[in-house]
Amino acid sequence: MPSVDVEIVNKDENGIGELKVKGPNVMMGYYQNEKATKEVIKDGWFYTGDLAYRDKEGYIFIAGRKKNMIVLKNGKKIFPEEMEDLVNQIDLVEESFVFGMPKGDDLLLSVEIKYNEKVAKEKYPNLNEEEIKKLIWNKVKETNKLLPKYKYIKNMILTKEDFIKTSTQKIKRFEEIKKFI
């Protein structure tokens, strides 16, 4: 973008770091919220909270949000948005929410799935709810094979209920997590 400077800072071993931007069209701060402004504007740079990387051609890709990142005990980082994009491609999945469920001193990578009852009845009319759950779980395990082992989803919760959302229809991640911990 013309007249906008972009940098990726605090990169990990995969080159993923926080995206920061500076320019005349970048926000100057939060309206009447100096504390929040100081958290994101530093030395004239706006720290977006987006975790990004640059490819060989110089294009920038967003991997996920800093506040949503799941960090395992071994230091491996998981971006739930990446996982949700894959899970949401399963025909029976209406929407999914990936999170780290506490297990001992680590996290168990889990997914809550709202399944599409209409699709289930149309495509699999002879399956009961338990069989639908098993079918979806098998499809999640197939999806796992596309990923490094540390990103494997190891637990699934199936629901018919809508997720708790903001007015802009984003999942309230921390509210959803409270249901399980």
Where would I find each of the regions flagged by the language model?
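Conserved AMP-binding/adenylate-forming
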Residues: 1-60, 66-69
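Generic structural signal for well-ordered beta-strand positions
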Residues: 9, 15, 61, 78, ...
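Short aromatic/basic micro-patch
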Residues: 20-21, 31, 77, 157, ...
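AMP-binding/adenylate-forming catalytic core of the ANL superfamily
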Residues: 23, 28-29, 51-147
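Ser/Thr-glycine-rich phosphate-binding loops at phosphate-binding pockets of nucleotides
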Residues: 48, 73, 166-168
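Conserved C-terminal "lid"/linker of ANL adenylate-forming enzymes
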Residues: 97-99, 137-181
